[in-house]
Amino acid sequence: MRSFLQQDVNKTKSRLNVLNGLANNMDDLKINTDITGAKEELLDDNNFISDKESGVHKPKDCQTSFQKNNTLTLPEELSKDKSENALSGGQSSLFIHAGAPTVSSENFILPKGAAVNGPVSHSSLTKTSNMNKGSVSLTTGQPVDQPTTESCSTLKVAADLQLSTPQKASQHQVLFLLSDVAHAKNPTHSNKKLPTSASVGCDIQNSVGSNIKSDGTLINQVEVGEDGEDLLVKDDCVNTVTGISSGTDGFRSENDTNWDPQKEFIQFLMTNEETVDKAPPHSKIGLEKKRKRKMDVSKITRYTEDCFSDSNCVPNKSKMQEVDFLEQNEELQAVDSQKYALSKVKPESTDEDLESVDAFQHLIYNPDKCGEESSPVHTSTFLSNTLKKKCEESDSESPATFSTEEPSFYPCTKCNVNFREKKHLHRHMMYHLDGNSHFRHLNVPRPYACRECGRTFRDRNSLLKHMIIHQERRQKLMEEIRELKELQDEGRSARLQCPQCVFGTNCPKTFVQHAKTHEKDKRYYCCEECNFMAVTENELECHRGIAHGAVVKCPMVTSDIAQRKTQKKTFMKDSVVGSSKKSATYICKMCPFTTSAKSVLKKHTEYLHSSSCVDSFGSPLGLDKRKNDILEEPVDSDSTKTLTKQQSTTFPKNSALKQDVKRTFGSTSQSSSFSKIHKRPHRIQKARKSIAQSGVNMCNQNSSPHKNVTIKSSVDQKPKYFHQAAKEKSNAKANSHYLYRHKYENYRMIKKSGESYPVHFKKEEASSLNSLHLFSSSSNSHNNFISDPHKPDAKRPESFKDHRRVAVKRVIKESKKESSVGGEDLDSYPDFLHKMTVVVLQKLNSAEKKDSYETEDESSWDNVELGDYTTQAIEDETYSDINQEHVNLFPLFKSKVEGQEPGENATLSYDQNDGFYFEYYEDTGSNNFLHEIHDPQHLETADASLSKHSSVFHWTDLSLEKKSCPYCPATFETGVGLSNHVRGHLHRAGLSYEARHVVSPEQIATSDKMQHFKRTGTGTPVKRVRKAIEKSETTSEHTCQLCGGWFDTKIGLSNHVRGHLKRLGKTKWDAHKSPICVLNEMMQNEEKYEKILKALNSRRIIPRPFVAQKLASSDDFISQNVIPLEAYRNGLKTEALSVSASEEEGLNFLNEYDETKPELPSGKKNQSLTLIELLKNKRMGEERNSAISPQKIHNQTARKRFVQKCVLPLNEDSPLMYQPQKMDLTMHSALDCKQKKSRSRSGSKKKMLTLPHGADEVYILRCRFCGLVFRGPLSVQEDWIKHLQRHIVNANLPRTGAGMVEVTSLLKKPASITETSFSLLMAEAAS
């Protein structure tokens, strides 16, 4: 290196002229200052470093000697340890920002090797150094008289420092004295920036094939002096300061004499295989300064991902350059974690001057491709085309922050907050800078704290600015949520289209949600006189005119009459020809809407006039009035109201259907004159709901004068008749309709209130669809009849059948004024009306109905005409008209006849509590609509033309489409029940509900081992039915065969018997056997039974009562023992069982005891005499036991007859509630099984008393509730009282809870008591 430097000193001036020309081009470069507050110009280097702080002496002129001014050189005697300590992270930063407000006064220490090669002098000829963003430029000036040994030693020291073992990122830094402000920020320490004019050389080879490539060059031009002899020194130096040891085998030491820096630099410029090592991005440091003195250009760069792509050249004159902290977030990284690469280039001969110039020109970076916003530091850079291409490639792979394009978001490196706009990030970074400023170290109060993140601020304005960040973030989240909630319109190509707007979607759920939005937009019109609500104003006006008699102008009435006449003629022509020709225009009846498509009109009326107009199927024609059919008569509004009231009371008081159609009676039915048929109901879900929806709204008489309805009111409540006066002929067969008239050959009878009347039916081929007519009245005392319009004087037959009783039918009202319903109208009806299922109420006289079905022929049921008649039908026949526009259907319920004779339901028996039954008629051959009969209390039966095929079933069987389980045969009525059932399958199989579509049903069914019950038609499992049957059966099934204990459920008995088996040592048995079966098998075996008795006798345990707690709330009671009628004379009802002679003796004794009891003195004497009497009973029992074999007593037969049933209504007058039970103490020997002991209470325990031997020493006390005997000395009363207190607490008394009740303790077999068992009982009582 020394020889190399000496050759450079002897270079000619022509060599320098080339570089001087290049340097002169940089004179106009200026420094851009970005940070506010940097208002001072950049001072000279001698002003930045004081003698006190850094020990750098101010040069007096530019020609001072090296020995005088080069005082920044550290002694080379510093060990590597000291140099490493100097480079440690604990040391303060080395770059001091001259213009920043956070200038620290701390001294800095230069590590070993960071020697200054030249004097600290600045003249007017000093050149500026241009660098890329994130790089450090330094300008070196070295006088001519400086010995070359210093440069060599400096390079040697630098090389030694480079080859040192890496410890930390800060230990591998090469420290430079910068000529300008390097702007970087340490997150933990304040940054210090030092302007320098020293140069540092490195004698490290940068080979092309090495794993560390140089991405920048350091070009040091050594200033010779004012005499013009400049020395150009170009050297390649790679400074790899990284936190990770990247290997030092690629470096060359100073002893390598074969190193040619010029050739290597040319090779670096010309090669295309250069790669750029990527490292984590750090703060970008750059500086520029225009110097009036000729200086060689030097540049220092670092390894970053940006590859100089964001650099830009912004010249300025002697201005301090600061970091734009608000535009970039990467400048917050520490300076000691950066990487630099130094290079020196020096051509050897003047022949390569042009080549060198070309190389420098190729290094000039095009600033047009640099985004001004992407780099906080704008510097100029020299790059080759190869490096530019590779930088562009690396930029495409790098994060969006370093891309030339606008990034999608701006992240903050201090916290996890992203910003879409740069200004928001700038504002956010101000708070981070504020927290790391020197004010943080001062005791400045920060009373303002953010509630959301907890940051504190000095003033309120800062807090308000900070809160904008959270507010904008919330707004952003709300916008995203709002976008998610908005329903996406898929356009007209979607499968589901909204009929009210242009919304379309393929998702049914989305379509339903969209439909709900239209419901919110609806406006309802409320009636002031009632609770009626209308969707349209026209509907409200019609309601007021019909229900309240208000004078309103209906838009339908005031419509163009001529237009409707034209429509009527067109329709009549089409009705004769057939349904092939159709009207071209369809007009809505409620609004001026017209359309040529019938389906469009249907949807229009369905969605817009669904509640105001019953005809939602939009039949535009066929409702026109005919003058020939009109009998203009005044309308009595009072009779209209009477009819409305009568119709509202048609249903039973508690009928569910009345609740369902309550609004229909008050609202929709009044406007039903505008239509004939109601809209098609939705899918039937429930039986009750299906009945309500299957009927059409009831028609009320219209009170408007223009309506063709005549209602004659009679003061004497004479019946009113409605009938058809004229009919017009049409092509019936073409329309598949029939005319129903009287048929004289066959007379059908209607039985009403014990009287019968003839019904005439006549069949005729040519007819119209107006074959069914309703003749009803508005009076509760009227009768309905059937008559012939052409022969009104037809007489009644003299003979008829009294037993005929038929069901109440639903009918369609057909008015006289409407002549026919053609094919056009019929096409507008829904398909379900063509094949309508008829459901009518079944009268409970099924036997007579069956007879009538057998006597009728099929021809009589084909076509009939239904009319109404009364006892004065012929004499008082007065015909009036009814508008066909009132054609409606409605289901009619009729409750069962309470006063029905028992013989009437012999064939088909119905329970009186079963509710409604219906008859099912299916008529698909002709449109035989049902007929409606008003006033069911007076008119019970009517007849209609229905098909012969019928069936009777309960109303719960009407419904519904059963849903079957895919894993078992169970069926369900609702999807909710099926879903819960399927969840049970999946839960037992260990699967989640979502896995039902993944796993096959066969696998789930096989893995589910639970026994399933097939559901019946009503969805009730068989298991529940079995429970109901068990409750209704005799309770003797739940009696323990061993001890006689009774239980209300089989489960309680099973648990009780399980305790018996456990005490007997039987703890294991077959899984398919119940404990009750195991005990019965053991008792059937006599040997095992004897062992059981011995085992039980060996345990001296006080027996417990077996009284179910549910008995207190039940109506009957099953006692353990039998209380005969003679015992208490209280009239208790007992079952008659065989009583042995011994039992009779016991009963006689008990009766004698009852007779002698009133003579006994009260008080203590009564108790003592009772004890004496008990001892007598003991002797009597011993005498009886001597005559009866003990073995026969304990056999199984005696056990079975032990317990009897007794119905004890526990009323207040029952003597069991107040009188002590009269029982023989000898009866308790049968209760010899061990019962579960109750929990012992806290306190003193009962002492086990020895069995006394004398009768005078023993007191025997008995419990009046359970009959338990307490035997012992006088102190036994204490236990007896405590026992009674438990009963009182748990007794069925007011405000004491339901618990034990008073029972009898008398047994039926006193002869079965032995001396041994009695002594055992005494011992148990004493214990």
Swiss-Prot record:
One of its GO terms (cellular component) is nucleus. Changing Y1089C: In MYP21; uncertain significance. SUPFAM superfamilies: beta-beta-alpha zinc fingers (SSF57667). Changing E1278G: In MYP21; uncertain significance. There is a cross-link at residues 39, 82, 112, 168, 185, 193, 213, 263, 284, 294, 299, 319, 339, 344, 346, 388, 390, 485, 509, 553, 573, 589, 598, 603, 627, 641, 645, 658, 676, 712, 718, 720, 727, 733, 762-763, 791, 795, 817, 835, 843, 962, 1009, 1031, 1088, 1094, 1110, 1133, 1157, 1165, 1176, 1192, 1205, 1234, 1308 (Glycyl lysine isopeptide (Lys-Gly) (interchain with G-Cter in SUMO2)). There is a cross-link at K346 (Glycyl lysine isopeptide (Lys-Gly) (interchain with G-Cter in SUMO1)). Residues 126-147, 779-804 are annotated as: Disordered. Gene3D superfamilies: Classic Zinc Finger. Changing E53Q: In a breast cancer sample; somatic mutation. Keywords: Disease variant, DNA-binding, Isopeptide bond, Metal-binding, Nucleus, Phosphoprotein, Repeat, Transcription, Transcription regulation, Ubl conjugation, Zinc, Zinc-finger. A zinc finger (C2H2-type) spans 410-432, 448-470, 496-518, 525-548, 586-609, 963-987, 1038-1060. The modification Phosphoserine is found at S199, S309, S820, S1000, S1189. One of its GO terms (biological process) is regulation of transcription by RNA polymerase II. It is found in: Nucleus. GO terms for molecular function: DNA-binding transcription factor activity, RNA polymerase II-specific; RNA polymerase II cis-regulatory region sequence-specific DNA binding; transcription corepressor binding; zinc ion binding. It holds the Pfam family zf-WIZ. Expressed in liver, placenta, retina and retinal pigment epithelium. Changing E274V: In MYP21; uncertain significance. Residues 788-801 have a biased composition (Basic and acidic residues). Belongs to the krueppel C2H2-type zinc-finger protein family. May be involved in transcriptional regulation. It is linked to Myopia 21, autosomal dominant: A refractive error of the eye, in which parallel rays from a distant object come to focus in front of the retina, vision being better for near objects than for far. This is Zinc finger protein 644. It comes from Homo sapiens.
